[in-house]
């Protein structure tokens, strides 16, 4: 590639990453649209990721063999599947801004998992990331009006603890933890072919979300998918194309930018999610949420700017 071509490719790389962040940051809207047409987010995730798997297998058939014959990638299937099933479900049933912020506790989990799985040393900077994430989560999760209630004895100390209380909160936290597992496993399996890792992540979304959808449908907790109809099929196919395109954009951008710059650009997902949610009625921004969110994003930014990344 010529110097001019390399410079042009480098210039497009940040735009590709911003596109990826935009797709994921605004994905809550089509997911809620599909929910309104009777398609639960778990069924949506399973169908979208299954279509993506078939597409990858058709374009890169070697990826299928790599996945089937590499047990190490099976853990990636589980981690990626839990990430997408939890996150997509959470942003449909919960406040989008709150869910995305809880999801971005990921740097906190990454520090702990990198220590346990990769044997990485816990540095002062890493400890600061944990402290920022923990403080931010405590502020976001602190129950409304509970501070004065504790002093008056109206509620117990346990009831006033800043812990997830709704299903959406728990799914946001679980999604972020699973994404941290996903990232640690990707680092551990960095020598594996890229198409095998990509297929593993898409297969995880299809398998985990599909299994949960089947189990909850059998239990009567989730409605079965509606009959084929243009209003939701068109959106489903469009969402599949968007997710595949965003994955390609992520690979393009991440391959051409340093990891720290990639991580910083990817934080724009929080901006896209927050602005779209506030504009379209998917969430609300309170002062407490803004303060807690600033600490959580600060921890993520500190992780992104860590030397040597």
Language model segments and positions:
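C-terminal-most transmembrane helix of multi-pass membrane proteins
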Residues: 2, 142-143, 263, 267-309
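Transmembrane alpha-helices of multi-pass small-molecule transport proteins
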Residues: 12-13, 23, 37-82, 109, ...
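Hydrophobic transmembrane alpha-helices of multi-pass small-molecule transport proteins
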Residues: 56, 125-144, 150-156, 288-307
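Specific transmembrane alpha-helical segments of multi-pass solute transporters/efflux pumps
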Residues: 26, 63-98, 103, 139-140, ...
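Loop-to-transmembrane-helix transition segments
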Residues: 12-20, 63-86, 166-175, 223-245, ...
């Amino acid at each position: 590639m010529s110097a001019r071509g390399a410079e042009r490719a480098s210039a497009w790389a940040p735009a590709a990453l911003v596109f990826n962040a935009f797709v994921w940051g605004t994905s809550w809207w089509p997911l809620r649209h599909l929910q309104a047409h009777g398609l639960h987010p778990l069924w949506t995730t399973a169908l979208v990721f299954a279509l993506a798997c078939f597409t990858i297998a058709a374009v890169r058939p070697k990826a299928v063999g790599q996945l089937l014959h590499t047990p190490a990638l099976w853990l990636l299937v589980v981690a990626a599947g839990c990430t997408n099933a939890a996150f997509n479900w959470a942003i449909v049933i919960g406040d989008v801004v709150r869910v995305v912020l809880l999801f971005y506790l990921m740097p906190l989990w990454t520090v702990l998992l990198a220590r346990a799985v990769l044997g990485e040393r816990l540095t002062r900077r890493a400890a600061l990331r944990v402290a920022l994430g923990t403080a931010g989560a405590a502020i976001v999760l602190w129950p409304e009006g509970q501070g004065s209630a504790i002093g008056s004895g109206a509620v117990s100390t346990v009831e006033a603890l800043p812990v997830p209380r709704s299903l959406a909160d728990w799914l946001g936290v679980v999604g972020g933890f699973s994404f941290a597992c996903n990232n640690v496993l990707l680092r551990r399996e960095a020598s594996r072919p890229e198409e095998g890792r990509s297929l593993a992540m898409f297969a995880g979304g299809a398998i985990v979300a599909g299994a949960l959808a089947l189990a909850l449908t059998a239990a009567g907790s989730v409605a079965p998918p509606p009959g084929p109809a243009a209003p939701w099929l068109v959106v489903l196919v469009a969402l599949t194309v968007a997710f595949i395109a965003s994955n390609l954009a992520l690979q393009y951008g991440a391959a051409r930018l340093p990891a720290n710059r990639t991580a910083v650009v990817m934080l724009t997902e929080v901006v896209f999610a927050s602005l779209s949610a506030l504009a379209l009625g998917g969430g609300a921004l309170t002062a407490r949420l803004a303060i807690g969110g600033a600490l959580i994003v600060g921890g993520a930014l500190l992780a992104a700017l860590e030397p040597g990344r």
